[in-house]
Amino acid sequence: MGRLFGTDGVRGRANADLTPELALAVAVAAAHTLAEADRSHPPLAVVGRDTRASGEMLEAAVVAGLTSAGANVVRVGVLPTPAVAFLTAEAKADFGVMLSASHNPMPDNGIKLFAAGGHKLPDEIEMKIEAAIEANATTAWERPVGAGVGRVHDLLDGADHYVQHLVGTVPHRLDGIKVVVDCANGAAAEVAPAAYREAGAEVVEIHAKPDGLNINDECGSNHLAALQQAVVEHGAQLGIAHDGDADRCVAVSADGDEVDGDQVMAILALAMRQAGTLTADTLVATVMSNLGLRIAMSREGIRLVETKVGDRYVLEELRASGLALGGEQSGHIVMPAHATTGDGVLTGLHLMSRLAATGKSLAELAAVVTPLPQVLINVPVGDRTVGAVAPAVRAEVERAEVELGDAGRVLLRPSGTEPLVRVMVEASTETLARQVAERIADQVRTASPVG
């Protein structure tokens, strides 16, 4: 069996790659593996899902697998990924299961597992679960019978409990703020408008009528056009877009301009430093964050720590160093004082709280970061490792770094899943960034031609 878990759990085309049989196998293996630490009681699992039509099918398979392994299940229904993590911790469950493929198209789905406390699983535990699936394929576990079979409890007020938790974290009420929220026809459709209204905002909601088929369909954080238009039409101070499982938050100013995760992080970092809650005056971001963020934070006296690409690496750094804020340009923002994973609705609340507290517009607050023009070229290659480290490629990168100096940067990264090398260049002008990126891309193509 190849590697089953990717950077964000198990994902694939539902009922083709991610079948009910595979979902059941993952659930059984997870129940056995994650219950090993404490055999004094039957394991307890919290299970939630987003709005994809396939979620009901996969939920049934996962619940069957868990209960057949002796685990009791708290089924919470349609909720955001961070809500499932929160309820896993609140219920003192042994683990949590979220069925979602986040921002991916509707036909995809995924299985994301949380450890006790609502934290993402470490790589070594995922590897143990994979090994258990392989072992069970040839030697079946002894299954409990009678009273040993797990039971299922439906939690009906999970959404309300989660909303109250979110609103309780807000440092300043949102009275006077008018916001348009794009719920991506996903897991945020109920809780995001409810949380924003509860905190005092006037809310206009769009793409908040999921039908199982329309999740992420030309809406949400990856498709901002409808939100940008709605913000201007309704005269709102801002717009907020979530993705299918609501772990992302991307914003739009009153003029309809995008405010990305880098700018949101900068706004929150300054707010938290003023409040004395930005531990060590440090922000955690990935290497894909725009150089403009680093320049802005340096100017403001805030240290920026960079990690590999992926919110799991941001989370690891936050936990290891005891820091209070981190995230990605894509809108995954993590505030460990209030959540164990990226939480789009939490981020939206704190962003609007800053607007309300300062009386400034989102455009004014976002202006702390001036993003540098960025060019990204995905170069098809025969061997992505060779294409990234060939001497001629490295020489061209070094030449570019000297040319750009402190006013730009180069990031060369082999894709983790495709035969591509990603060439990213930031510079003072888009023309210069494109020229430099094309030169490097040409060297990559020469070093590792396709075919």
From Swiss-Prot:
Phosphoserine, modified sites: S102
Entries under Gene3D superfamilies matching the protein: Alpha-D-Glucose-1,6-Bisphosphate, subunit A, domain 3 (3.40.120.10), Alpha-D-phosphohexomutase, C-terminal domain (3.30.310.50)
Signal sequence, renumbered to the chain: none
Names of required cofactors: Mg(2+)
Keywords: Isomerase, Magnesium, Metal-binding, Phosphoprotein
GO CC aspect terms: cytosol
PROSITE patterns assigned: PGM_PMM (PS00710)
UniProt xrefs under InterPro entries: A-D-PHexomutase_a/b/a-I, A-D-PHexomutase_a/b/a-I/II/III, A-D-PHexomutase_a/b/a-II, A-D-PHexomutase_a/b/a-III, A-D-PHexomutase_C, A-D-PHexomutase_C_sf, A-D-PHexomutase_CS, Alpha-D-phosphohexomutase_SF
Active site: S102 (phosphoserine intermediate)
Record GO biological process: carbohydrate metabolic process; peptidoglycan biosynthetic process; UDP-N-acetylglucosamine biosynthetic process
Cofactor note: Binds 1 Mg(2+) ion per subunit.
Post-translational modification: Activated by phosphorylation.
Catalysed conversion reaction: alpha-D-glucosamine 1-phosphate = D-glucosamine 6-phosphate
Gene Ontology terms for molecular function: magnesium ion binding; phosphoglucosamine mutase activity; phosphomannomutase activity
Binding site for Mg(2+): S102, D243, D245, D247
EC number annotated for this UniProt entry: 5.4.2.10
Function statement: Catalyzes the conversion of glucosamine-6-phosphate to glucosamine-1-phosphate.
Family classification: Belongs to the phosphohexose mutase family.
Protein name per Swiss-Prot or TrEMBL: Phosphoglucosamine mutase
